[in-house]
Amino acid sequence: MSVLQDTEKKMAAALDFFHKEVKSFRTGKAHPALVETVVVDVYGTTMRLSDIASISVADLRQLVISPYDGNNASAIAKGIIAANLNLQPEVEGSIIRIKVPEPTADYRQEMIKQLRRKCEEAKINVRNIRREANDKLKKDSALTEDVVKGNEKKIQELTDKFCKQLDELTKQKEAEIASI
């Protein structure tokens, strides 16, 4: 695999990771991503909620969690509370309902700050990938200086492309948070 392909793959992975992180931001709308990564103690081990239950959206502000094993309902509720997501699960038999509260203005501002911080962290990650790729190119003695410079330019174009995508994702999520 060439340095360019490897670099693009790593940058795409960084973008994908940021996208997954952003999906878990609470916007006031019910979304399965809010709780699917919650860790629950069941069967003597810890498991992700998405592995032991189905999560669906009942309406705009309510999630319904249906455990595959009904006996795990209380453990799931405890896991959600322990995750400190500011969500209050209600156990109804073997089903858990979660009403997603409407975020306050202060909470929205804090979420936007966190979002921007995560975006900057992702950009730093992309720039670090660029630096590593450029270092690899410079260390490769088989390449001529012109080839190295050309590849560095292509790597910079990749970096710009992925940073722009990160900014666009951030703007979309900011608009979503602000429009609540």
Swiss-Prot record:
GO cellular component: cytoplasm
A GO MF label: ribosomal large subunit binding
GO biological process, one term: translational termination
Any one Pfam family match given in the protein's UniProt record, by short name: RRF
Compartments where found: Cytoplasm
Primary site of residence: cytoplasm
Keyword field contains GTP-binding: no
Coiled-coil intervals, chain numbering: none
InterPro entries: Ribosome_recyc_fac (IPR002661), Ribosome_recyc_fac_dom (IPR023584), RRF_sf (IPR036191)
Gene3D superfamilies for the chain: 3.30.1360.40, Ribosome-recycling factor (1.10.132.20)
Keyword Protein biosynthesis: yes
Keywords: Cytoplasm, Protein biosynthesis
Free-text function comment from the UniProt entry: Responsible for the release of ribosomes from messenger RNA at the termination of protein biosynthesis. May increase the efficiency of translation by recycling ribosomes from one round of translation to another.
Record-stated family: Belongs to the RRF family.
UniProt xrefs under PANTHER family: MITOCHONDRIAL RIBOSOME RECYCLING FACTOR PSEUDO 1, RIBOSOME RECYCLING FACTOR
Record NCBIfam families: frr
The protein, known as: Ribosome-recycling factor
